[in-house]
Amino acid sequence: MRRLFFFLSHLSVLYREDSSGTMNRTPGRRRRTMRLRDTGLTAEELKEMVNKYMVETYERYDFIAERAEGMYLYDEKGMPYLDFYGGVAVNSPGNCNPEVVKAAKDQMDDIMHTFNYPYTIPQALLAKKVCETIGMDKIFYQNSGTEANECMIKMARKYGTDHYGPEKYHIITAKKGFHGRTFGSMAATGQPDTAIQQGFGPMLEGFSYARYNDLNDFASKVTENTIAIMIEPVQGEGGVYPATQEFMEGLRKLCDEKGLLLLLDEVQTGWGRTGTPMAYMGYGVKPDIVSMAKAMGGGMPIGACCATDEVARVFTAGTHGSTYAGHAVACAAALASVTEILDKDLSGNARRVGRYLKQELSKLPHVKDVRGKGLLVGCEYDIPIAVEVKHEALERRVLFTAIGDSVNRMIPPLIATKKDVDQLIRVMRESIDEAAAKYLDMKMAG
């Protein structure tokens, strides 16, 4: 079984210098992946360590993930957990996909980080693969989804300044959208009354929010200062709401008529998730700029912002940059991830298994709506039990997320099968029954 090394500094290759001054590789001792038993800690002691030293912004699942493979995570006791959250849409080619792991480890042996002064092979090969696959001209590498969106916002604003003047910076985004947690992407997120924006002082100005899937509302927000419209093809954090065909086509037409840029945030939907390599390809609508991350790296941190030549040329030396962006190991892993998704037609699998998943979810008790595209699916209940359903499923070693009180979201690796769905549905039925009984008991008691 393939195993990752615990940390980048613990490589399986040692180096020595020969008489000619060159560096020759010699085999080193393999280091095991870190296991709980190797630390001398108990499970509870490790959890206490996390709680003591780490900032608490995440609701933890109550188990230690020691390793992962395919559709499963394994805890410190070797017990399997069926993965229907995929690291939040990251592990699309499967947890610890062998090709992605091999590409990263092989690249570590050659070169890891250089900054962006010299040319590197992984950067070049990945850039060509991405641009030719999705029909865009240029790529700017980043390290995460929020950085990719920051890049997209900056590029749009720079385009507005260069072509129309410094007042052309206004961007319209969607209510209940989500674009990230750094200041530009946070301001673009149409959730002003939630913890995402509350308590952080004034938001970056220049954003207005319109109702998702309401073309007239978006059109009404356009002013003389507007330069772009920015949306997600499927609102993930907003409850899993896909854009309608009419809405997407209408936004493209509106942008063309008003001289605006269309920005698509495909951090979650990109690379096969919705049934096509990029979600916009399924709509037949091309953006001026698109962001991506998550599945792109197949488990390694990487993001990117892709644009047309006309828009991309506003970025010149000094206008944007990043120390780690385009990291050789991340690019090598991303090339393997994208290749796996394309060569194995995981987009097609997402369409087929996604249809089956929605069909089976709709048969469950208390389900009033099932929506989504491909393997990005939301299941909404007629009572507020989503969080408790998630907890009950965790007890049965099946993982998925909750959005608010009433929606569970399924975003598994794109290698999921109908058999995996059947296992999920069995557990969800039991979990819904338990959660609903608790809710009704509590309601009667209250």
Predicted regions and their residues:
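Short, Lys/Arg-enriched N-terminal segments with co-localized hydrophobic residues
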Residues: 8-33
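Extreme N-terminal basic, low-complexity initiation segments
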Residues: 3-7
